[in-house]
């Protein structure tokens, strides 16, 4: 098949859509119409019965692709030089191959096909192109055929829109970051102001600490100079806990000493009382049986010392007045003890009643003296240890 047959069919269909005012291009919305014109030519040839053809030329899937392209790229300009690439990217086959495969038994479009379909007359575009070519080779230059497909152009346009969206998003993000940066700068300024304030406070506190340290050193020097004076106060730096602990330790030691002394005094009192009881028992052997009545009488007297003493004096005078005649008689009646006797008794010791009275008063005097001595000792220790 010569290229003239295919070009004649294509130019005929193109001329049905393209107008002189268009500028040698059709819009994307006209692509289905162009395909329909070409398909009508072949359907008309089949009806005439001159040729056996494989119809339809385009499947429904391909027609759907043409319609989709026309809807999405309505005002997309399709130039004649760009048509082959656009068509191939849509159906993955060139238009020339589809038209050649439509004839059964031949591999190309028959030359008489154009004559039979009255396609020999050139279209207006062929005439215009021929006129332009006759004017001169340098006047008219063919358009440079684009190698980019409409899908690439569509993807480029989509990419352009996506880039525009990204640019807008980046602008908004940049604005937000600028606002955030301004806020951070404001916070940094506030932090700098606060830092300066804290530095000033720190310098002031450090100065006060230095002044206090100097004053403390001066005070310590003054206190150390006054330590030689007995009446000078103690250094304020002494640990109060150590002082209290030392006081407690001394107080405990004094308390233990006092307890020990009191126990010793009690033991001494017990020993004296036992000695008095022993001496008193010895003296009982020199008395008569009539002393039991006197002992019972004395024990009935109240425990108060002074009352007992008064009563005892009265009783003694009464007894002396009653027994004095008997004493005289007893003294003169008995002989003087022999010199060989180991025990030399006084005249009053020979009488049981007189010896009892004398020994009673001596015992009371000894007990009172010992009691006063022990009481004085207790008072002395209490005053010494502050009890």
Swiss-Prot record:
It is found in: Nucleus membrane; Cytoplasm, Cytoskeleton, Microtubule organizing center, Spindle pole body. It comes from the Eukaryota. GO terms for cellular component: cytoplasm; nuclear membrane; spindle pole body. The chain crosses the membrane at residues 311-327. Residues 220-230 have a biased composition (Polar residues). It is a single-pass membrane protein. GO terms for biological process: protein localization to spindle pole body; spindle pole body duplication. Residues 157-269 form a coiled coil. Its main location: nucleus. Interacts with BBP1, MPS3, and SPC24. This is Monopolar spindle protein 2. It comes from Saccharomyces cerevisiae (strain FostersB) (Baker's yeast). The lineage of its organism: Eukaryota, Fungi, Dikarya, Ascomycota, Saccharomycotina. The gene is MPS2.
